[in-house]
Amino acid sequence: MPGLLDRSTIFVREHVGMFKAANAYDLLDPATGAVVGLVQERVGGFFRKMLKFTQWKTRMAFHIEFHDLDGGRDEVVLTVSRPFTWFRSVVTVADGTGRVLGRFRQKLLSISPKMWVLDPAGHEVAFLKGDWKGWNFTFTDAGGAEMGTVTKKWAG
């Protein structure tokens, strides 16, 4: 069985709840519907949880873990984190051991989501552009060639 990061397509199912301070998602194999992974946001402390329900939510620091559940294991294979930010976000992506794989740096003053994808040394390697709704994203290389897409489709 392929590991979570070896898959080219994954379906994401959000854990639904009222007044959630932390987000969680199941990662599903599109062919079988089997749960192959879990994404869990870690929010520590009562004060931080309460801030998640205010206008500061979009500026707050976050730490998200991607767990590979394939084959009965529960292994953190990826983390995504961001410190508190005022204007331009820098999101760090690391492997399960904490080694930085790259970063996303937000473009300042943009109506639709736009970010540069940086390698561990901070060099721009790709560009991520979303539509105005933030549902569909396209990764392009330095020459403008499409490298991949992320699409959100409402299924409920």
Predicted regions, residues:
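Intrinsically disordered, low-complexity proline/glycine-rich segments
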Residues: M1-G156
